[in-house]
């Protein structure tokens, strides 16, 4: 269980990760102009990424490409297929993404669309030894609630897994979303132990005054924080990961507004310091 964080690839990022004590990076491929895409398009670019990571004692825990798979932009669709080819060359076995959603349809009516998109993707991934991990973020887009990712609750996970019936689809488990949705994230860890392929470490702070003013149907009554600065019980969470014999890695997903901009590095170091309390020393490398 190695500790890393989500970021675009760069030499500066790799050096910072090593200096701070991280053992891994989840490479963020979301942006069309991400440095990762520039590097892999060059001759020997993939090898240069591998070499830079190895020189600094780091591994790539996963590749993250989060978009609406059901209604993708053309570059996203093509980019995801490229990742299926790139991942094995980087010795990466997990690609993380969203399911996507037609926001005008119910969750149940999106399941056939999910099946149509993911059945061939999962077959291609299986042929290359790749697992696809779906992050459990609702990606809310206003009210009434629509969102662009249906995979936000255990009931829906069951519908998804039943629809495609593939061993290489699972979850990128993020407790921060489950917390404000009112779902027991510890019980969910236990219930879906065989389907957790990657973990995002992100905390949640409930802003009680705003919640009481706007109700649960309002916006902005919670905010995401670095691990240790919100209300997630990280000691219990990581203890449960050990209890269920989780074999993957953990990546901090930094969306903390207090430590944004120039304070980003300070925030990541703070998150590392907190989570390191609960991770066995031999598993940090």
Regions found by a protein language model. Give the residues of each.
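Active-site acidic/histidine proton-transfer and metal-coordination neighborhood
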Residues: 18-19, 52-55, 71-170, 180, ...
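Histidine-acidic metal/acid-base catalytic patches
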Residues: 1-24, 54-57, 91-92, 144-145, ...
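Aromatic/hydrophobic pocket-lining residues that form π-stacking "cages" and hydrophobic walls in ligand
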Residues: 13, 49, 83, 121, ...
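Glycine-rich, proline-tolerant flexible connector loops at the mouths of alpha/beta enzymes
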Residues: 26-50, 102-105
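Active-site-proximal loop/turn and secondary-structure-junction residues that shape catalytic pockets
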Residues: 9-11, 29-31, 66-69, 99-103, ...
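Conserved beta-strand positions in the central sheet of alpha/beta enzyme cores
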Residues: 26, 62-64, 96, 133, ...
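Short, flexible/disordered intra-domain loops and linkers
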Residues: 33-42, 142-151, 262
